[in-house]
């Protein structure tokens, strides 16, 4: 209510970030469903299971996002499965810089793929 009634903002998107259905406020209050995922070990994944978990919490189809990830999704798996993640954000520092979590080649492959929307599009 603060942003809408006091600041008079009318172009907000409300993001719910949790895999737990118990905390879901309801479809009328949420525009985007998301979740944070930090795998304990590296594996190629499109995060399909996690996608299915969060969409099961809604009765309407919502935009779904990976709010924070350690390992970026595998672009080849995403192309094949067509999981409609709207966006992902790789967390900072060691998750973005260096080769421990996401290699430069993996990151470059994702950003250069047709699956990614780029600024010039």
What does each model-found stretch correspond to?
Residues 2-7, 54-57, 88-94:
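Structured segments of extracytoplasmic/periplasmic soluble domains
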Residues 35-56, 61-62:
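Substrate-binding surface in catalytic domains of secreted glycosidases
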Residues 61-121:
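Substrate-binding cleft of secreted/luminal carbohydrate-active enzymes
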Residues 7-9, 25-29, 58-59, 80-82:
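Extracellular/periplasmic catalytic domains that process cell-envelope and extracellular macromolecules
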Residues 19-43, 90-93:
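Aromatic- and acid-rich polysaccharide-binding/catalytic face
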Residues 1-22, 61-72:
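Aromatic-lined carbohydrate-recognition surfaces of secreted/lumenal glycan-active proteins
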Residues 10, 49-56, 76, 105, ...:
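Polar/charged alpha-helical tracts
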Residues 16-24, 45-54, 70-79:
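Alpha-helical scaffolding within the catalytic cores
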């Amino acid at each position: 209510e603060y942003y809408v009634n006091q600041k008079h903002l009318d172009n907000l998107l409300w993001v719910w970030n949790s895999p737990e259905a118990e905390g879901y406020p309801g479809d009328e209050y949420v525009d985007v469903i998301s979740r944070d995922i930090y795998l304990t070990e590296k594996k190629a994944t499109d995060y399909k299971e996690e996608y299915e978990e969060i969409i099961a919490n809604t009765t309407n189809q919502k935009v779904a996002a990976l709010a924070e990830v350690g390992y970026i999704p595998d672009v080849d798996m995403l192309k094949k499965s067509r999981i409609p993640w709207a966006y992902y954000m790789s967390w900072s520092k060691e998750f973005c810089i260096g080769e421990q979590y996401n290699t430069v080649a993996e990151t470059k492959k994702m950003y250069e793929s047709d699956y990614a929307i780029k600024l010039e599009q």
